[in-house]
Design a protein with these regions (language model features):
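Secretory targeting and sorting signals
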Residues: 1-21
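N-terminal low-complexity, Pro/Thr/Ser-rich intrinsically disordered segments
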Residues: 19-35
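A short beta-strand motif characteristic of beta-propeller blades
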Residues: 30-37, 72-79, 125-131, 166-172, ...
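Beta-rich, blade/repeat-based domains predominating
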Residues: 36-53, 80-105, 111-116, 131-149, ...
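Beta-propeller domains
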Residues: 56-79
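A short loop-to-beta-strand structural motif that recurs across blades of beta-propeller domains
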Residues: 63-66, 115-118, 157-160, 199-201, ...
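Short loop/turn segments that connect beta-strands within beta-propeller blades
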Residues: 67-72, 120-125, 161-166, 204-209, ...
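Glycine/small-residue-rich hydrophobic helix-like segments
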Residues: 198-261
Length: 301
């Protein structure tokens, strides 16, 4: 969420004082475990490769970092050519898509369309521009056919990018769509709604004009600022509540519980991959505090 740089100063004071409206998830509630840090960074995007290596982006410097395992140092591997670095997602050709152009222009993203995507060859660390002309690339995911979807939490337009580089900047309309994750069957694109009518929606790829809300927040949680989400192996959305400082799991429409707390400025969550490093089944959180935490209560074994 590009808003993180604006929220971070206030959130660290406010979030610990709030009382959650949601119960702790069964078997969860353990303290988060610090597993990595990028000093001075505001971490925005995250992805894990098949070998368990974690990649993350810095909204401020535009750099992409790699951590080979929990506890390992963050190694800068690339810098985007314009603006802050945003979302990450794996392309069908094995390259890592890197969203960029995440700066003040996103406030007028639907008009200016500053959002762009580059491709990172993770074997050589060569970053090559791919497409531009999106409202933003704050959230990003790729379907099995290679089509990518990109969101802007300060706009209304969700873009679609075809494998050949064609861009459809206004594929769908949903105010303040944030994050992006496709269901296992590519039927739905799941997004958080951060600032406008906060909650979580899913958008049918076959009918993008008919988004379905699966969570509408109310009361104090209306100000929780849900951010970049993931899906567990059962297809349940796992959502960081940025201002709340909590990680939520949505068990059914309208019903959510708390996996972890005490994590203000959380920007995104991701499940690990592979058998080593940031391994499969383990849930990790990044944030605008530059820290990476494991969420033990979110283990998906």
């Amino acid at each position: 969420m590009a808003a993180g740089a604006l929220l971070a100063g206030a959130v660290s004071v406010v979030a610990p004082q709030t009382v959650s409206a949601a119960p702790v998830c069964p078997g969860a509630g353990q303290a988060p475990v610090l597993v990595g840090r990028v000093p001075g960074a505001a971490l925005e995007g995250v992805a894990v490769d098949g070998g368990g290596r974690l990649y993350t982006t810095d909204l401020l410097s535009g750099r992409v970092f790699r951590l080979d395992a929990p506890g390992a140092p963050a190694v800068p591997v690339a810098t985007v050519p314009d603006g802050g670095a945003g979302a990450l997602a794996w392309a069908s050709d094995g390259s890592l898509l890197v969203g960029y152009g995440a700066d003040a222009r996103v406030f007028l993203g639907d008009i200016l369309r500053p959002g762009a995507i580059a491709k990172l060859n993770t074997a050589t660390n060569v970053l090559s521009p791919f497409v531009s002309g999106l409202s933003a690339a704050n959230g990003l995911d790729v379907a099995a056919d290679g089509t990518a979807y990109a969101t802007n939490d300060f706009g209304t337009q969700i873009g679609r990018v075809f494998p050949d580089g064609r861009v459809e900047p206004h594929w769908a309309t949903l105010p303040s769509a944030n994050g992006a994750v496709l269901g296992a069957d590519d039927r739905y694109l799941y997004v958080s709604r951060t600032f406008v009518n906060p909650g979580v929606s899913r958008i049918p790829l076959a009918n993008p004009g008919a988004p379905e809300s699966i969570l509408d927040l109310a009361g104090l949680d209306n100000f929780a600022a849900p951010d970049g989400l993931a899906l567990d192996s059962r297809g349940r959305p796992v959502v960081p509540a940025n201002v709340r400082g909590e990680i939520w799991r949505l068990d059914s429409p309208g019903q959510y519980c708390v996996l972890a707390s005490g994590l203000p400025t959380s920007s995104m969550v991701v499940y690990g991959q592979g058998s080593g490093g940031f391994s499969a089944g383990r849930l990790f959180r990044i944030g605008f505090d530059g820290a990476i935490y494991e969420i033990p209560g979110g283990f998906d074994g």
